[in-house]
From Swiss-Prot:
This is Relaxosome protein TraY. Its main location: cytoplasm. InterPro entries: TraY. Keywords: Conjugation, Cytoplasm, DNA-binding, Plasmid. GO terms for cellular component: cytoplasm. It is found in: Cytoplasm. It comes from Salmonella typhi. Part of the relaxosome, a complex composed of plasmid encoded TraI, TraM, TraY and host-encoded IHF bound to the F plasmid origin of transfer (oriT). One of its GO terms (molecular function) is DNA binding.
Amino acid sequence: MSGNIGANPIGKKVNISCSLDEAIDELLMESALKSGWSKKREAELRLEDHLRRFSLVPAEEQYIEKKVD
């Protein structure tokens, strides 16, 4: 799989759904407008980026970045 965010992944895609509060939805919409992506694509890219960069999100919301070799 390519390490490029936004590259077409190898393998089958799955659908998920989640709820966002209005403030986060607004931030997502603003980001999508700035990037030119659809709101759905913006969310996909941001989730992929976050999961690749961070190994854990503790309850205290102090993110622990993954070590990059």
